[in-house]
Amino acid sequence: MAYCLQTLKGISLDCESSMGGIKAVYLANFEDVKGVTLDTAGEKITGFTMSEGVKFKEYQFRKNTGSMNSTLTADETTGLNYVTTEVSLIFTKMETAKRIEMTALAQAQLAVIVLDSNGIYWYTTKDEYAAASAGAGETGTAKGDRNAYSLTLTSENNTYPFEVDAAVIATITE
């Protein structure tokens, strides 16, 4: 019987603080990302090749309203193994400019970089693009309720999101 052997290295206890949530998201059309460069170990992104003149756009939102969740799907019987990543965002105050952007995002095939609350950048779309899988516009009922658009971007890739070297971000975003 053949076995799928992997080199295991272990994970030691990390005693540093680990903050939940995300701070920002950077989006581009997936087709405009022509390639990524990995470090020598093949585990961290150290560069992007973009279409001429194209950069990732920054999407900002209020604190504690965005998240990134990656879920492994594995089936030993079929040999299936992939990771679904969902990036959920809330943009407060419904208005025309945001409605237009939400409509564009709902129809786009996207490349996604997420900045988490620990200051680490993650590229969620190394193998396949992300697309809108859910969204809403809501006014709320009471004065204190949220008035906002929400959007979930979903991608399916061969592995969990790749970390992006922070030095690269300034060269590929605007």
Regions found by a protein language model. Give the residues of each.
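Structured, beta-strand-rich domain cores
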Residues: 63-127
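Solvent-exposed edge beta-strands and adjacent loop segments
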Residues: 13-84, 129-143
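Generic structural motif
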Residues: 11, 16-18, 30-33, 64, ...
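Mixed-charge, glycine-accented linear interaction segment located at domain edges/termini
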Residues: 128-174
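N-terminal alpha-helical "arm" segments
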Residues: 1-23, 170-174
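Well-ordered beta-strand positions in beta-sheet-rich domains
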Residues: 58, 121-123, 150
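Generic detector of bulky aromatic hydrophobic side chains
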Residues: 15, 108-109, 149
